[in-house]
Amino acid sequence: MFGRFIRQYSTSKNIINVNELIVEKTKTPFQKYTDKTKLVFGKQFSDHMIEVQWTKEEGWGVPKISGYHNLSIPPSASVLHYALECFEGMKAYKDSNGKIRLFRPDQNMNRFLNSAKRICLPEFNKEAVIELIKKLCVLDKDWIPEGKGYSLYLRPTLIATQNSLGVGASNSALMFVIASPVGPYYPEGFKPVKLIADDQYVRAWAGGSGAFKLGSNYAPTIFPQLEAAKKGFSQVLWLLNDYVTEVGTMNMFVFWNNAQGEKELITPPLGDGTILPGVTRDSILKLTQQWGEFKITEKNFTMTELAKAIKEGRVFEAFGAGTAAIVSPIESISYKGENYSIPIDASLNCGPLTKRISDSIMAIQYGETNSDWSVIVD
């Protein structure tokens, strides 16, 4: 996919040396949360962070873990003017034995690297970043809340720091990782969401950057989201020429009887740059394929087709999928002034498949089910 991009940096300069890591423990630790049930996503941060500087001339510098602190970059830094920035979202979990676990960190690093390439930020050795993240998790292990649904959210980020207003590949960059303790997305059980499908605004398009985790993809979605909220909707169901793409910041899944009468779990395909390759998305596809109980399809489908299927009673469930919630059940979609209701099991506040997927993935994340997807942090 990236063959058409010119490789600008030598391989030797793309290596982060974990053995050179410098650890400076903070002398002013934060006051840690006292009630984990009151944690709010992204509002409190752990004591330490990772930083690694990069320059075109020298490559990656010495990695460092130190106390959480503000960054110092010039006001002309490329990231501030041209959005040369990419990031990841992943979590560290603490199992019932107190062991720290990461969920498929290799997949996050694959996407992180692909995002960096897309905007000409420096390449890096993925394994080294995972090792640095593990060391941060061990150092800040007391910040990982115990219990199902609780975790330490990790935010690897890579920004261009070149001191220039010219539009082009940056000759300097900074990678950093911060961490935030978080609670369950649905602390009191699933809460189905109401969507509005509106083609007035477009999140991504073929050949664009929607398949990469760039900050520039998120800023334009805020206004449509606020407009949707004013109308009483939880999220926007993003369309592209009537084709269903994503829901809010999540991948979209529909479980239905398709037009051929087959029971099918369907999600929009990757490949044209429109859909973000979600780690949870991939996990759901692989997990349900292992079950072998119904057809699994990555295929484009339109909102018109979905509305018709709902009217005909062929839709069993629909849900969004992502790191924050794992799955988010959908109870209705507003489309062209008409409301389309999707079945919800009142006893579960979601559909049976949605619940089963959530339970299955969470069991892996917390080490209850043995899987190589769950990586123990030594």
From Swiss-Prot:
Required cofactor names: pyridoxal 5'-phosphate
Gene that encodes the chain: bcaA
Subunit description: Homodimer.
GO terms under cellular component: mitochondrion
Keyword Transferase: yes
Catalytic activity line of the entry: L-leucine + 2-oxoglutarate = 4-methyl-2-oxopentanoate + L-glutamate; L-isoleucine + 2-oxoglutarate = (S)-3-methyl-2-oxopentanoate + L-glutamate; L-valine + 2-oxoglutarate = 3-methyl-2-oxobutanoate + L-glutamate
Chain segments annotated as coiled-coil in the UniProt record: none
Domain of life where this protein originates: Eukaryota
Keywords: Amino-acid biosynthesis, Aminotransferase, Branched-chain amino acid biosynthesis, Pyridoxal phosphate, Transferase
A GO molecular-function annotation: L-valine-2-oxoglutarate transaminase activity
PROSITE patterns with a match to the protein in the record: AA_TRANSFER_CLASS_4
Reported function: Catalyzes the first reaction in the catabolism of the essential branched chain amino acids leucine, isoleucine, and valine.
EC number: 2.6.1.42
Modified residues (N6-(pyridoxal phosphate)lysine): 213
Entry keyword annotation includes Metal-binding: no
Organism annotation: Dictyostelium discoideum
Alphabetized InterPro entries for the sequence: Aminotrans_IV (IPR001544), Aminotrans_IV_CS (IPR018300), Aminotransferase-like (IPR036038), B_amino_transII (IPR005786), BCAT-like_C (IPR043132), BCAT-like_N (IPR043131), BCAT_family (IPR033939)
GO biological process terms held by the UniProt record: amino acid biosynthetic process; branched-chain amino acid biosynthetic process
Entries under SUPFAM superfamilies matching the protein: D-aminoacid aminotransferase-like PLP-dependent enzymes
Protein name: Branched-chain-amino-acid aminotransferase
